[in-house]
Amino acid sequence: MKNSKSRFTLGFVLACAAITFSLAVCAHAQTVTFVYDFHASGQQSSALSVIQGTDGNLYGVAAGGAYNQGQIFQMTPTGELTTIYSFCSQPNCADGEGQEPMPILGSDGNLYGVATFGGNATGSGTFYKLTPAGQFTKLYTFCSAPGCADGQWPHGFIQGRDGNFYGTTESGGANNSGALYQLSPSGGFKVLYSFCSLPKCIDGGTSNIIQGIDGKFYGTAGKGTLGGGYLYQIARDGSFNMLYNFCLYTDVNCTSGSYPSPLVQDAKGNFFGTTAYGGVNGGGTVFEITPNYQFHMLHGFGVHNQASDPIFGITLANDGNLYGTSVDYGYDGGRLFEVTPKGVYTELYSFQCCYDPFWKPPFQATNGLLYGTTLYGPGTCCYGTIFSLENGISPLVETVPVAGKVGQSVLILGNGLTGSTSVTFNGVAAKFTVESDTYIKVAVPKGATTGIVSVATPSGTLNSNPQFVVTK
């Protein structure tokens, strides 16, 4: 498909006062490039987000496709987009339908994903595998158990340290309020926790989860004891703990904000996220929650003519800073922003009317660029775009998975890997094979400990983000 690209460069270094953009901090130049425009390319579509494959290309899901029920696409770094699978290719949409959530790259190099709808007569969604060659396999159909006790309408998911997949559903489960499930690569399924199991359903609501550095699962959801959402922990045995409660934004002095986004975690065990509303200025927050569950607000949104409503969460990039987007309901097309761990805020880009950043924070590729999507695009404002941000961030490598035992096989994604001379896990040398210029296969070496994975390439050393956790 023909690529449509437009470029906006914000060339400010020190003379920020001479530029009309409203910026909190002056720094190096940023470049936002609209890499792909669905409308200009003749597609009535918009994408949710993108991820990186072993071939260095970006993959995602979008509306449209051959049957107008969603598609999985591949996009080159230069913006050439190809549909590799259209949902509802099977009779009665047995393969699933929908344009969310995002697929992930599995430790075997295949894409894994969930389709929110379709699959069976209840239309409750599916879990699938897609090979690089485009071979589609349905691994599970939700609402296969009586009363949808296995969950209905899946959200996002992760691949755990044990190789199994873990995710949540919007509905179903024992209490018809969603469930956290485990699914093996071969399709073996079990529910670990059914939400709304506590009195008055204070544990209601579901969202995406992460696996913490301690191996337990963490997520955020609505409700809670104060009504504004909560942070929870679920162990692999299904035991549940409510760790922090957010206030309701309509309450006086709701400084923590309400309705938290999915989380990210740094190497020290701190959690970072956003709240959609509330906070000191009423327009949401970027927050940090420490390992002992102490809350710190890093930035409050909602000041007049500035960003507000950062409902999609944030990305922790390898420069140590947090990147996200805001919706700015009623003002403009949203903003792209950066917040340091110390709370220093920078507005990087203001989207024009009708753009609207989509439902995910930016994704960092191994070339150092951050990629994101918009719901709408320029001109007729009908369909979406995929954009990139160049912010002077160094290239990196990514490990898949991000944790594993000694001897376990790991994929290392990157760029310019041909001719690499060493791979180390926190300083311990590993045996490796360069499969292509964009990925390496390696086994976790004996003696390795949790820390950074480094690859010595002909152009310099590349380090991993996040750190690799060595498990027992």
Give a label for each model feature.
Residues 2-472:
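Extracellular beta-propeller repeat domains
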